[in-house]
């Protein structure tokens, strides 16, 4: 774990509005234990360093892979009621609705950690469900998943802009104005975005592609540190034109 005092600017003139501080949290992937720890760290940081307007931005991929997707969504819903927060959609949040309407989607979803999500809702899937089991599991999930969980995942934003910063799950397609970006790219893009060294319209804060430590570039920062496998959930604290600190579990 680390609590780095970054206080550095790698992106030129990009800055947040005066008085705004953003806590951006990377991919959680079913690790409710780490999310709970991180939210406590953020609360402690806020108490030590009061800000006129603190916003927590969650970068998506709350479910799958880790053991406690249901508990993660409960924590996020509780946070939504008490704090100023922005919840972005990750590619993994698209699987639930797709599976409920077309159970064979589980062929793809299980390869992305979907079975762990089903287990968190009390279902008991086999390792490689056939079509009849997929249909049964979809019916069981429809009965067991709280409506507020479905409504939460359906309400997630694709991006959030604040000052000169853009917060998004995966990234953006280079050369395409932000207003014209496609949902598929915002949720899934990798190489074309990651390899681009040119300045973007805004400095991009993202997750989606796991890295060992936060990857800070001149045009973006990646804070997906593979929490479900590494035990390291990362939060970038941004204020003015600098990363004030990097919090980690």
Where would I find each of the regions flagged by the language model?
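Metal-dependent catalytic neighborhoods of phosphoester/phosphodiester hydrolases
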Residues: 62-78, 98-105, 215-216
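Acidic, His/Gly-enriched loop-helix segments that form or flank divalent-metal centers
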Residues: 101, 112-119, 123-222, 226-232, ...
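A short acidic-Thr-Gly-centered motif at the start of a beta-strand
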Residues: 11-18, 48-49, 76-80, 158-161, ...
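Catalytic-core regions built around general acid/base machinery
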Residues: 72-82, 148-155
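Active-site neighborhood of phospho(di)ester-bond hydrolases with catalytic His/Asp-centered motifs
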Residues: 25-26, 57-60, 86-90, 203-209, ...
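N-terminal active-site segment of His-dependent metallophosphoesterases
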Residues: 1-73
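Short, glycine/acidic-enriched loop or turn micro-motifs at the edges of active sites
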Residues: 29-30, 64, 94, 172, ...
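Active-site HxH/HxHxD metal-binding segment of metal-dependent hydrolases
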Residues: 83-116
């Amino acid at each position: 774990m680390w609590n780095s005092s970054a206080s550095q600017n790698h992106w030129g003139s990009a800055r947040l509005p005066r008085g705004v501080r953003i806590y951006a949290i990377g991919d959680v992937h079913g690790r409710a234990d780490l999310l709970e720890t991180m939210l406590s760290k953020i609360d402690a940081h806020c108490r030590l360093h009061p800000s006129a307007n603190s916003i927590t931005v969650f970068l998506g991929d709350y479910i799958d892979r880790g053991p406690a997707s249901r508990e993660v969504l409960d924590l996020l819903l509780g946070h939504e009621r008490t704090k100023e927060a922005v919840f972005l959609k990750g590619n993994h949040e698209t699987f639930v609705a797709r599976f409920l309407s077309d159970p064979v989607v589980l062929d793809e979803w299980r390869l992305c950690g979907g079975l762990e999500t089903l287990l968190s809702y009390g279902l008991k899937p086999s390792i490689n469900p056939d079509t009849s089991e997929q249909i049964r599991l979809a019916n069981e999930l429809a009965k067991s998943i709280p409506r507020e969980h479905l409504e939460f995942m359906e309400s997630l934003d694709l991006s959030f802009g604040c000052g000169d910063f853009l917060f998004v799950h995966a990234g953006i397609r280079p050369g395409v104005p932000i207003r014209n970006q496609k949902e598929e790219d915002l949720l899934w893009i990798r190489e074309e975005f990651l390899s681009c060294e040119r300045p973007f319209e805004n400095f991009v804060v993202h997750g989606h592609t796991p890295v060992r430590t936060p990857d800070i570039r001149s045009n973006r920062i990646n804070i997906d540190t593979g929490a479900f496998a590494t035990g390291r959930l990362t939060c970038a604290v941004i204020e003015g034109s600098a990363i004030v600190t990097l919090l980690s579990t």
